[in-house]
Structures are given as structure tokens and as C-alpha cells.
UniProtKB/Swiss-Prot annotation:
Gene3D superfamilies: Ankyrin repeat-containing domain. This is NF-kappa-B inhibitor alpha. The modification (3S)-3-hydroxyasparagine is found at N210, N244. The modification Phosphothreonine is found at T291, T296. There is a cross-link at K21 (Glycyl lysine isopeptide (Lys-Gly) (interchain with G-Cter in SUMO)). Disulfide bonds: none annotated. Its main location: cytoplasm.
Length: 314
């Protein structure tokens, strides 16, 4: 028969011995690491721990439902507030999401960030707030344009000033050198649209006045000649544009003046351009046409053509 009393007695007899064993194990556990680390090693470890700096990371997409809601065009709540020019609401949203770079730099279906839209809608104050909150000025839209490209294309000097003065020097250098998917820098776009104030401002900030677009190798000065803009030509020359820089086909800005109405541009460039870059190169087709005065014996035209049973007279 099973006797509970007997087992209780056995447990009582073994109790003190087990308690002593447990006490020894605890003592061993506490003392096992004693003197395992020297003082100098400990001090070095403390020093290294103090020098650890956590790297800032982009905040993950927040769990708030309004942050995750998108339209069919991929616009977030912030995109829509900027599009509809709800400035008070926009500033409130920016204040709430400050530091959430994933949300601030979110791109819609046209790859436009809120900063792109602030420039497109001509809201430089909103653009400044977005930049201070952490928006990236180097992100590109579906045409490869940064927000500064758009500001130069639209001729908005206020937006250009905000974008160039609020961003960091590293961002500014990168944006000034960046080309869109047509190969145009911000300076090219400002030149194409004839915004002289923006051109001068960009060059002052360090934009390369002799940068060549990749399609034909034209500089801003070549573009100014193409557009027949004498004031832009004068400004670019004042800013140090190279009059002897040639396109990929070998044409100087002066050579592009031939056959064009502005004699003022031709006079401006003619005084500075090398002599060998002033005359147009002769076309190979024209040379071959001029030297070919008569047909050779093997190249005489046919004189026995028959069409519909009738002899043709050439």
C-alpha cells in the first residue's frame, strides 16, 4: 500500500542535505567569475562602451492609419495637403511627422515627393519647412528632375533661393551637378527658358558654366546661341563661359551663329573665338558633289529605258 506518511518522512530527512547543496551551487555561481577580468581590461571596456554612438536611422513607417492611406495616384495625406495649398494643415502635418524621413520623402506614382509638389505649386515657405524637417532635395521625379530642376524650369527665384540656401553644402553640390533624364543640369534649364537671374545665381553658387549636355555636347552658351538670346550670351561670357568649347560634332558657339539673324551675338563671340573655330567646316557631301563634274564611262545614264512598250527619252 502506498503510505504518504512514509514519503513525507523521507523528504524531511533529505531536506537539509539538499538545502546545503543548493547553497554551495549559488556560492559557486556567484564566485565563478571572480578576478577573471583585470582592472585595465575593465577600464578599456568601459571606455569603449562610452564611445559607442548610435547611428541615426530613418523612422519606420508609423502605424497611424492616416499615414498609410494613399490615393490611386499614390499621393499621401501630405501630398494632397500641398496640392490643394492647405498651408495651415500642411504645416501641422509636417510638425507631426518631423523626423519620419520615410513619410516625408515618400514618392507618388510620378515619383514626386512632397518637396517636388511644393515647388510645382509655388509654395517656397512649405518647401523650406519640408527641408528643415528632413526632406531629401536630391530625389528625382519620373523625368529625372530634382526639385531644383523644377524651380529653374518654372523660373521661380524664391523657390530656387530656398532650395539652395536651406539644404546642406553636400546636397547643394550634388544637385548643381545632377542631370535629368534629358541630360540637362539646372543651369541648362534656366538657360533654355531664359531666366537670367537664376543663371547668375546658380553660377555664383558653383554651377559648372561649361557643363555639356550628353546628347550633342552643347554648353549653356551653345544653347543661348540656339535660342538667339544676346543678353544671356553676355551674362554667360561675364560668368566665364568658354567660347572655344565645341560640341561633339566640333562646332563652337560662334559657328552656330551662321545663318541666324542676331548679328549682335556674332559680334560678341567673334572677338573672343579662335580663328579656326569661326569658319564652318566644309561638308564632305558638298566636296564630293563639287569634284564630280561628269559621269565616268561606267556611270553614263541609261538611254534605252522602255515603259509600257514606249521608249523613254531622257
Amino acid at each position: 500500500m502506498f503510505q504518504p506518511a512514509g514519503h513525507g518522512q523521507d523528504w524531511a530527512m533529505e531536506g537539509p542535505r539538499d538545502g546545503l547543496k543548493k547553497e554551495r551551487l549559488v556560492d559557486d555561481r556567484h564566485d565563478s567569475g571572480l578576478d577573471s577580468m583585470k582592472d585595465e581590461d575593465y577600464e578599456q571596456m568601459v571606455k569603449e562602451l562610452r564611445e559607442i554612438r548610435l547611428q541615426p536611422q530613418e523612422a519606420p513607417l508609423a502605424a497611424e492609419p492616416w499615414k498609410q492611406q494613399l490615393t490611386e495616384d499614390g499621393d499621401s495625406f501630405l501630398h494632397l495637403a500641398i496640392i490643394h495649398e492647405e498651408k495651415t494643415l500642411t504645416m501641422e502635418v509636417i510638425g507631426q511627422v518631423k523626423g519620419d524621413l520615410a513619410f516625408l520623402n515618400f514618392q507618388n506614382n510620378l515619383q514626386q515627393t512632397p518637396l517636388h509638389l511644393a515647388v510645382i505649386t509655388n509654395q517656397p515657405g512649405i518647401a523650406e519647412a519640408l527641408l528643415k524637417a528632413g526632406c531629401d532635395p536630391e530625389l528625382r521625379d519620373f523625368r529625372g528632375n530634382t526639385p531644383l530642376h523644377l524651380a529653374c524650369e518654372q523660373g521661380c527665384l524664391a523657390s530656387v533661393a530656398v532650395l539652395t540656401q536651406t539644404c546642406t553644402p553636400q546636397h547643394l553640390h550634388s544637385v548643381l551637378q545632377a542631370t535629368n533624364y534629358n541630360g540637362h543640369t539646372c543651369l541648362h534649364l534656366a538657360s533654355i527658358h531664359g531666366y537670367l537671374g537664376i543663371v547668375e545665381h546658380l553660377v555664383t553658387l558653383g554651377a559648372d558654366v561649361n557643363a555639356q549636355e550628353p546628347c550633342n555636347g552643347r554648353t549653356a552658351l551653345h544653347l543661348a546661341v540656339d535660342l538667339q538670346n544676346p543678353d544671356l550670351v553676355s551674362l554667360l561670357l561675364k560668368c566665364g563661359a568658354d567660347v572655344n568649347r565645341v560640341t561633339y560634332q566640333g562646332y563652337s558657339p560662334y559657328q552656330l551663329t551662321w545663318g541666324r539673324p542676331s548679328t549682335r551675338i556674332q559680334q560678341q563671340l567673334g572677338q573672343l573665338t579662335l580663328e579656326n573655330l569661326q569658319t564652318l567646316p566644309e561638308s564632305e557631301d558638298e566636296e564630293s558633289y563639287d569634284t564630280e563634274s561628269e559621269f565616268t564611262e561606267d556611270e553614263l545614264p541609261y538611254d534605252d529605258c522602255v515603259f509600257g512598250g514606249q521608249r523613254l527619252t531622257l
